[in-house]
Regions:
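GNAT-family acyltransferases
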Residues: 1-88, 99, 103, 107-141
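Phosphate/ribose-recognition catalytic cores of enzymes acting on nucleotide-derived substrates
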Residues: 93
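ATP-dependent phospho-/nucleotidyl transfer catalytic cores
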Residues: 96
Length: 141
């Protein structure tokens, strides 16, 4: 419910965060639809295909936003990251962005992360990697 409240409190600004063709979040999205979406994120996380994180305040009684780490379709980027902060905490947006960039570089060892609509790391020469069906993100336990 905390995630749903955060999404709906910022629904208009979040429209198009995943690209102009994405309908998320719909203005009439229900709690049940939100829960179904969270279940998909949980399954993707378990399968190591993509990683979604909720961002909470210190007391964990308010969801402030989310971070989504997905595989990149481009060989120039190791991952694609979308993140958002709810409208009433928007002053934390830049801090979250900088924290996530640093975390990906230092802990995940991602040197080329794309942040659509925000920032793209300068592409480095792509390394040849074995093509697999699932995302090959470093394991973070």
């Amino acid at each position: 419910e905390l995630d749903f409240e955060a999404v709906m409190s910022s629904q208009q600004r979040l429209q198009g965060i995943f690209g102009s063709g994405s309908p998320w979040p719909k203005s009439d999205m229900t709690l049940e639809e939100n829960i179904a979406s969270l279940k998909v994120h949980k399954q993707e996380f378990a399968l190591r295909q993509a990683f979604a994180y909720s961002v909470f305040n210190k007391t964990k009684n308010k969801c402030l936003g989310s971070v989504y780490i997905d595989p990149s379709d481009s060989p120039n980027y190791q991952c694609v990251v979308h993140l958002w902060i709810r409208d009433d905490s928007i002053e934390l947006d830049h801090e979250l962005f900088q924290t996530v960039r640093k975390w990906l570089q230092e802990e995940w060892r991602f040197s080329n992360a794309a942040f659509p609509g925000r920032y793209f790391e300068e592409p480095k020469p792509a390394k040849k990697v074995k093509s697999t069906v699932e995302c090959q993100l470093p394991r973070k336990d």
